[in-house]
Design a protein with these regions (language model features):
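Residue-level detector of anion-binding/catalytic polar loops
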Residues: 31-32, 58, 99, 142, ...
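Histidine-acidic metal/acid-base catalytic patches
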Residues: 1-7, 11, 15-26, 97-99, ...
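Active-site-adjacent beta->alpha loops and helix N-cap segments on the catalytic face
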Residues: 41-51
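Active-site-proximal loop/turn and secondary-structure-junction residues that shape catalytic pockets
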Residues: 9-11, 37-39, 65-68, 105-109, ...
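Conserved beta-strand positions in the central sheet of alpha/beta enzyme cores
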Residues: 34, 61-63, 102, 144, ...
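A short acidic, helix-capping loop that chelates divalent metal ions and anchors anionic groups
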Residues: 68-73, 109-115, 151-152, 185-186, ...
């Protein structure tokens, strides 16, 4: 297993000014960092590459749909722009040296049209990711599509649907990011959710039920790690939380209070817990 932490605890816009964070993160016991990428053209590629080289860490990339772009829009022009944005981000992911780009890469987070998704929207997402599959393979990058809870998206919520989506996409470079925070809301049993997505599981977010420190809430971690071991997953375990001092991110994630004594305590206490659970 490799242990990662999303830099959204500290910043939503990584640049060279954040490089001093990386040695501290390394010293806390992490193998890598996860960095948010909005648009590849604006990403601090050189700064991140330097920070990783200096610390011996690796990275993964997380991404979301920006500028109201969507793979499920009924407007073909919007879908085409969304595919091009993802192509750009995939290429930049490879340029950084990362192998994973993960996130709810289908529709904007928080877009809730007040109805169920349609069969046509589903087909659009499948078609778009089938277009992107060869581009991912060319760049030796894997996309891990993330189901979110029902309060953040209407399109993809459950392990069953995520596995079916990847079955229909049918490309080995397209899989699933499964996050315990969202699974705690949407799954009857989180561990069984991991078993359901096993054949497509590419990335894991180890997050507590309140997005606080792993091990401090009611996620049944023993069962989760038993399932992860059972299915043979040996990739990243990444802590994702959000600093309350980042208003735009805190508002989007509905973080209205402190989740720990300090935002970074979620990460530094959390990784000790994860290492204990996986020892």
């Amino acid at each position: 297993m490799r242990f990662g932490v999303n830099l959204l605890i500290w910043t939503a816009n990584f640049d060279a000014s954040h490089l001093p964070l990386l040695p501290r993160i390394r010293a806390a016991g992490f193998d890598g960092v996860e960095v948010l990428m909005y648009k590849g053209r604006d990403f601090a590629v050189d700064a991140l590459r330097k920070g990783l080289a200096d610390t011996g860490m690796e990275c993964t990339i997380c991404s979301v749909m920006v500028d109201d772009l969507s793979l499920v829009s009924d407007d073909a022009a919007i879908r085409a722009k969304a595919v091009e944005q993802l192509r750009e981000n995939i290429a930049t992911t490879a340029e950084v040296g990362a192998k994973i780009i993960a996130g709810p890469m289908y529709a904007p987070v928080g877009y809730l049209p007040g109805r169920r998704r349609t069969a046509e929207e589903w087909k659009r997402a499948v078609d778009c990711w089938q277009q992107l599959g060869p581009w991912l393979a060319q760049h030796e990058v894997t996309a891990a599509i993330e189901p979110l809870n029902r309060f953040e998206t209407y399109f993809l919520n459950t392990a069953v649907d995520a596995a079916r989506l990847c079955d229909e996409i049918g490309h080995s470079n397209v899989g699933i990011l499964f996050d315990t925070f969202h699974a705690n809301i949407e799954e009857k049993n989180i561990a069984d959710g991991y078993r359901t997505v096993a054949r497509h599981l590419k990335h894991v977010h180890t997050c507590e039920n309140d997005r606080g420190t792993p091990g401090s809430g009611h996620v049944e971690w023993m069962q989760v790690f038993e399932a992860i071991k059972e299915i043979g997953y040996d990739g990243w375990l990444t802590i994702e939380s959000f600093g309350s001092n980042l208003p735009e991110i805190a508002a989007a994630a509905a973080i209205w209070r402190d989740l720990a004594s300090t935002p970074e305590a979620v990460a530094f206490d959390g990784v000790r817990f994860l290492k204990k659970m996986t020892a």
